From Swiss-Prot:
This is Fructose-1,6-bisphosphatase class 1. PROSITE patterns: FBPASE. It holds the Pfam family FBPase. Its EC number is 3.1.3.11. Pathway: Carbohydrate biosynthesis; gluconeogenesis. It catalyses: beta-D-fructose 1,6-bisphosphate + H2O = beta-D-fructose 6-phosphate + phosphate. It comes from Actinobacillus succinogenes (strain ATCC 55618 / DSM 22257 / CCUG 43843 / 130Z). The lineage of its organism: Bacteria, Pseudomonadati, Pseudomonadota, Gammaproteobacteria, Pasteurellales. Mg(2+) 1 binds at residues 90, 113, 115. GO terms for biological process: fructose 1,6-bisphosphate metabolic process; fructose 6-phosphate metabolic process; fructose metabolic process; gluconeogenesis; sucrose biosynthetic process. Homotetramer. Keywords: Carbohydrate metabolism, Cytoplasm, Hydrolase, Magnesium, Metal-binding. Substrate binds at residues 116-119, 209, 242, 272.
């Protein structure tokens, strides 16, 4: 069985001029995933990592203890890499420039949601980690700047997520398809389990927080009703499945076919998910797996970021389902 390390080295060998920078970064992400996996698996046995940390992040959201732990673990691991010039996280107010000689001469920056769905930890529901890798655009030899992090998603060189569920799985792309690796704790390695993942072109699952229904745009309300209607020709009604962890909902829909929607709403006029930490990496993965991702109208990967913690409405998943949802958004403008 092929391991993640073997796969990365094999892919690197296909590019004679590759210097192994991405290999090193992915090795650090793999290590962080193993550390977070370990701590999540003992969450019920230790009060040190359960519950709230007593702080709020820049979005005004209460941070869980594991949010802080995962963020700090990510930051320390990346600071140790000579390939990484800086880091931005959903849990940090601002980006972090690794202002050392090694950091100033590095060529890559990382953006991450270190622990997506962390409010589920206390009730033993799957959570995840999301990451995104870009080449810096500021001059090598200087500290990274805000502009390095404000790049549109189509400039990503790699993106992925780790889902911590009944098993721990790392899924990533470098722009040449999507592959998944399941962690074998007895060996301490990630093994190839899902090669060349493809999202089915359609499915029977829609994932949306229907408790917010009254706050949604009319186009989304109409699409939900469409999903609930009986129609044998289109295999409706569809099944509603919503975990509350983007990684978990996205992962299920990628394997089984479906659509995930977190739209704008009266309480979140610009959407809730973060473009840079959640939207762009998941959109990159979706497109590489044959799916679609947009804000209801426009391709996510073409959006020019205006703020580090910018929010965005998010429609992602099976191509035909996203297209149908987009039709309702166009037909019922606000």
């Amino acid at each position: 069985m092929k391991t993640l390390d073997e796969f990365i080295v094999e892919k690197q060998a296909e590019y004679p001029n590759a210097k192994g920078a991405l290999t090193g970064i992915l090795s650090s992400i793999r290590l962080v995933a193993k550390i977070i996996h370990r701590d999540i698996n003992r969450a019920g046995l230790s009060n040190d990592i359960l519950g709230y940390a007593g702080n709020q992040n820049v979005q005004g959201e209460n941070q869980m203890k594991l949010d802080v732990f995962a963020n700090d673990t990510f930051k320390r691991a990346l600071m140790a890499r000579e390939e990484v010039a800086g880091f931005a996280s959903e849990e940090e107010d601002d980006f972090v420039a690794f202002d050392t000689e090694r950091g100033r001469n590095a060529r890559y920056i990382i953006l991450t949601d270190p622990l997506d769905g962390s409010s589920n930890i206390d009730v033993n529901v799957a959570v995840g980690t999301i990451f995104s890798i870009y080449r810096r655009i500021s001059p090598v030899g200087t500290p990274v700047t805000l502009e390095d992090f404000m790049q549109p998603g189509h400039k990503q060189v790699a993106a992925g997520y780790v889902v911590y569920g009944s098993s721990t799985m790392l899924v990533y792309t470098t722009g040449n398809g999507v592959n998944g690796f399941t962690y074998d704790p007895s060996l301490g390695v990630f093994c190839m389990s899902h090669e060349n993942l493809q999202i089915p072109s359609t499915g029977r699952i829609y994932s949306i927080n229907e408790g917010q229904y009254l706050k949604f745009p009319m186009g989304v309300k109409k699409y939900i009703k469409y999903c609930q209607e009986e129609d044998k020709a289109t295999n409706r009604p569809y099944t509603s499945r919503y975990i509350g962890s983007l990684v978990s909902d996205f992962h299920r829909n990628m394997l089984k076919g479906g659509i995930y929607i977190y739209p704008n709403a009266t309480n979140y006029p610009n959407g809730k998910l973060r473009l840079l930490y959640e939207g762009n990496p998941m959109a990159f993965l979706a497109e590489q797996a044959g799916g679609l991702a947009n804000d209801g109208y426009n391709r996510i990967l073409d959006i020019e970021p205006l703020e580090l913690h910018q929010r965005v409405p998010f429609f992602v998943g099976s191509k035909e389902m996203v297209k149908k949802a987009n039709e309702f958004m166009r037909d019922y403008p606000e």
